[in-house]
Design a protein with these regions (language model features):
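N-terminal mature ectodomain segment of secretory-pathway/periplasmic proteins
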Residues: 32-110, 150
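Acidic/charged, solvent-exposed loop-and-adjacent secondary-structure segments enriched in E/D, K/R, S/T
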Residues: 108-139
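Solvent-exposed coil/turn segments that connect beta secondary-structure elements
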Residues: 58, 78, 87-89, 102-103, ...
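Bacterial N-terminal signal peptides
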Residues: 15-26
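Gly/Pro-enriched, hydrophobic low-complexity segments
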Residues: 113-117, 130-133, 156-258
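A short, amphipathic edge element
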Residues: 35-36, 135-153, 204-209
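Bacterial Sec-dependent signal peptides at the C-terminal "C-region" and cleavage site
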Residues: 26-32
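Bacterial N-terminal signal peptides that target proteins for export
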Residues: 2-17
Length: 266
């Protein structure tokens, strides 16, 4: 009887262990890969039509105070061209940023000159850059980061006081023309919306922390209407990028031309 009882207990322990392993395996199988999460993010951010948006950038600097920039953003879908026209403050009115093809320019009204710029050019002196406005696909720019054993760096966490269920993942650049070579991202587990991002240098120094909130569903896609950029190098410096109004209507081709920006200055 004792041997039978021992055998029964051992069988029960083995069954319990097997069940736990099966549950763990099921959980691992249900967890998407980092690449799959990146694909979901690309799908969410994908815009399939021309777009016009009113945007406000509020930059707070401990030395220079607060600056508010009002602008209008135009995007042409067929070639991903975009135009940003500054409306306020008065000192910057008529300045702009134009991207057509692989070329990007900054226009200054007071000198009526165009300067060829890179994706890391800051818009109006804020922490938001020209590259942040582009709609380049994540999968074309970044790849999953792996640990010493070759496994993707991916975990399940909760974020913020609301304890939002998120995936925490790490990616590294696979092209050279990106603003940051390494990113750590927090993405919701249900709709794959990016809520937080930490941006690092090659040496592993944290350079910027970004937050994406106030998502709005538009034509089956989700657009963050509020972006916050926290400068981790210049402490106390932050930029808030707000989309005030957004419309998906055709934008005329003549607007994506240097001549159009010049006419606004007359």
């Amino acid at each position: 009887m004792e041997s039978q009882g021992y055998a029964f207990a051992r069988t029960a322990r083995v069954a319990a262990l097997a069940g736990a392993l099966l549950l763990m395996a099921a959980g691992l199988a249900a967890q998407p890969s980092v690449q799959k999460i990146i694909d979901y993010i690309d799908t969410n951010y994908e815009v399939r039509s021309d777009m016009t948006a009113q945007a406000r950038i509020t930059t707070k600097d401990p030395d220079q105070g607060t600056k508010v920039i009002e602008s209008v953003y135009y995007r042409r879908d067929r070639d991903d061209a975009f135009l940003i026209v500054i409306a306020e403050p008065e000192t910057d009115r008529g300045n702009g940023y134009l991207r057509v093809g692989d070329n990007m320019w900054m226009y200054r009204r007071n000198t009526r000159t165009f300067t060829h710029i890179g994706r890391d050019e800051k818009i109006g002196g804020s922490n938001a850059s020209a590259g942040d406005i582009e709609t380049r696909k994540f999968k074309e720019l970044y790849k999953p980061s792996v640990d010493s054993s070759g496994r993707e760096i991916l975990s399940e966490e909760t974020l913020g006081g609301a304890k939002i269920p998120v995936y925490r993942l790490e990616v590294v650049a696979k092209v050279n023309d990106v603003k940051f070579p390494k990113l750590v991202m927090w993405v919701t587990r249900d709709k794959y919306l990016e809520l937080k991002r930490e941006s690092y240098s090659l040496s592993g120094t944290l350079l910027e922390t970004s937050y994406f909130t106030n998502y709005k569903e538009v034509e089956g896609r989700y657009v963050p209407l509020l972006w916050k950029f926290v400068d981790e190098v210049e402490k106390g410096r932050t930029s808030l990028f707000e989309i005030i109004g957004i419309a998906f209507e055709k934008v005329e081709d003549y607007m994506f031309d240097k001549k159009y920006l010049e006419t606004l200055s007359k």
